[in-house]
Amino acid sequence: MANTSLKNKKRLWLGLKTAHAQLDLAKLMFFYGDSFENHQIYELDEATEILKHPRFDATKETTLYIHGYIETPEVESIHVIVDAYQKNGDHNLLVLDWGELADGNYLLDAVQNAKQLGPKVATVLIGLFSNGLQRDLFHLVGHSLGGQMSGMVGRSIFKKSKETIKLKRISALDPAFPPFYPAIGTTAISKNDAVMVDVIHTDAGLYGAPRSTGTVDFWPNSGKTLQPGCPKRDYKLLTDIGLKDLCSHRRSWRFWAESVAAKDTPTFHAVKSKSWSDFKKFRVDESYIIQMGLNCPETARPGDYYLQTNGDQPYSKGINGITYEKNENVVFPTND
């Protein structure tokens, strides 16, 4: 008994769970219609039933959204994302509800559960692909820890399919920082997890990834805290965070939702540059402009892209966002 206890303590210190996560607590939600209430919940092992739903349109792109730590379908982010896709109207929207597994201690519970759930979701998606879901019409999107889990899903699909299936696109919205940079018993999302991985950084170095981690990395307003319009933060620990502290981190999904709702209308224009400092000095490649968000081209040239946004909705400044404008009423980070 003493040896078992010691072994468990060692596992805890290493950030390892002593028991397998109850993966059946996670569900898939299929949204249809024009209100949040229009959805149906499926067990992961019954996911292929989604394809039989009368409102599932196999000719449309299917998006799977994975939320972050201590989130559930009841929180604002899910409602904003769902509303945006419903306004767009051109997508089958699935949401992975893993709220009961994304709770508890961040490192010892949520991260470890994500590491187990990612491969399970990969198996579910392979099953969907085998039953008719078109791979070239599938898009995986995740925020924070959900962004990191998206990478886990992509890697697992590639491995489980014996390198025959690679997701077309993963979009990571301010993917979680600890414990992925440096990797401590984990592997961070990377450009290798899908054919194209686009990343939106809004709280880099605090709750979000501190460095470029995709095929294309967007750095709106430097990609760091404070994002324009966000209040001064208290810099609390993950165990005692408030909405004030999460404002910059959450701005990533707000940007994403705005781009989705805009549909084909150009929104967040971004330009390639070596750094935020160079962007402010107009050292940019104006010959190549792309959009941040849903309409980021899947053929985008790899690299780092910068832009400015407004501090409130609409966040997009359109084409004006690629030209730095000093605003005394907005606090920008002083570092590059």
Q: Positions of the model-derived regions?
A:
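Flexible, membrane-associating and regulatory peripheral segments of lipid-active enzymes
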Residues: M1-V95, A102-N113, A122-R135, S161-I165, ...
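The conserved beta1-alpha1 loop
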Residues: I66-G68, H143-S144, D174
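Tubulin/FtsZ superfamily GTPase core signature
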Residues: M152-G154, I170, G208
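Active-site nucleophile loop of the alpha/beta-hydrolase fold
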Residues: K168-P179, H201-G205, G223
